């Protein structure tokens, strides 16, 4: 998917990018490849592949109507090089975006990237989701939490649901169908007072399969969740 194909595909879906937004995506690509020489950000560095498998892929929640350009709080857990939240931020500049990532080098990249792209309303924190999830400044503060290929739902739910306000949504993006994951996560979601409202398979323009799962938070998360760092992965709910 060339940049021109990318812009045309977005336009056909009702998103006519400004020159500034096009420049932001172009500069994002350049910095991603440049910094990838120094720190491991991605295995995908071919321009057409980045525009398809990172940028277009990240925008699925917006293109499908689940995230709109409004002034709400979005948290991205384990965003790595900023996916999916920073492409979403470029397309929806009114969003307030927070990223938590466990590698400080990636946070350094994200700070530099956001300055270069002229993004405002973005905040980056180094640390573990389990620790931030027990911090009152972060717990139950977000309308949406995104996670792209972070962990299976049984684990991911404990790492993300505590950050949501009641009525907020977890939007999880994956490469494979999530049916079995949701079966395995049934107990975790019950314990966390959360409920799946969407589990949908779709295809990228090149035919690659993808999945989007949306989970609603129904009630306040019990205080003991998330458990200490590492425990959700070792002993899933």
From Swiss-Prot:
Q: What is its main location?
A: cytoplasm
Binding positions (S-adenosyl-L-methionine)? 78, 83, 129-130, 148
Listed InterPro entries: rRNA_ssu_MeTfrase_G, SAM-dependent_MTases_sf
Listed under GO cellular component are: cytosol
**Keywords, in A-Z order:** Cytoplasm, Methyltransferase, rRNA processing, S-adenosyl-L-methionine, Transferase
Annotated localization? Cytoplasm
Q: What class of enzyme is it?
A: transferase
Record's keyword annotation contains Methyltransferase: yes
Q: What is its EC number?
A: 2.1.1.-
- Which family does this protein fall into? Belongs to the methyltransferase superfamily. RNA methyltransferase RsmG family.
Function summary: Specifically methylates the N7 position of a guanine in 16S rRNA.
Listed name of the protein: Ribosomal RNA small subunit methyltransferase G
Question: Which organism does this sequence originate in?
Answer: Streptococcus thermophilus (strain ATCC BAA-491 / LMD-9)
